[in-house]
Structure formats: C-alpha cells, structure tokens
Amino acid sequence: EQGHVHLFRRGPDGTLSHLTGLSLDERGAPLQWFAPNLWVTGGRWLRTGTAARLLRAPDLRLRGPLAGVALWLTDLLCLYRQPLLQMLRQRDAAIERHCAEQGLTPRQARTDRRIALWQSTPIEWPRDAVAAIEGSPRFC
C-alpha cells in the first residue's frame, strides 16, 4: 500500500460517519477496501443497514479539480457494492466474536485500541472491472 483514502458520510448535524477505506498502490490503483475500528477514524458508527442504503446510490460531491476523483470513487462504490456489504457484515460478525471472547459490549469493542482493523476485502484491478463489463453478478 502506497496510501489510502477514507470515505465518510456527513450527517444532518455535521457529524461524520466512516463508510469505508480504500487502499491504493503507488500508481493510484485500488488494492483493497477496509473497515477500521471507530477509534481510528472517530465520528459516529455507521451501521451496516445505513451503509447499504448509502451504497445503493452513492453521491460524492466534490467540485473543481477533485470532481473527477469523486466520479471515480462513486463508480468504485457502485462496482463494489456487494463486496463492500459482505465486508461490513463480516466486520459486524468479527465485532460480535470479539465481544463474546473479551466480555465487551459492542460500544467497548469499537473503542478497543487493540483492534485497528475489523475487516478488509481485496480488489483485483483491472480484472474486477472486466468481470463487471462482462456482466458478473458480483457487481452492480
């Protein structure tokens, strides 16, 4: 990984909720989606059901020179909607297991600094894009 970006949703009250992270290689090609723990990103916890609604019609708004980046990220969110939802369900299952093993509440698990990353899912670029063009049911 050369770098990564975090995608947030801004609530009506201005509070940020983390949707997902995207790791990038040195050329800027996507490597993996990831779901960090809440203490890593701060803000409000985004439930999987809410994330599912947001991923049905992602709407990233950037103006000026970053408008193209917003379009690219929006297309990636659409392309990877199903894998992202699967990753978030796996995140929730990992939190449940951690709570059971450690005797924690979900709120305590989300602030447990021993856990930085709950789940990730790989991106196989450009193979995934070709599969989407060819109609693979894995994508939108």
Q: What feature does the model see in each segment?
A:
Residues 7-11, 83, 128:
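Generic signature of intrinsically disordered, low-complexity segments enriched in small/polar residues
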Residues 125-140:
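Charge-rich, low-complexity intrinsically disordered segments
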Residues 1-40:
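Aromatic- and glycine-enriched beta-alpha-beta binding-site module
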Residues 29-123, 127:
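Mixed-charge (acidic/basic) macromolecular-recognition segments
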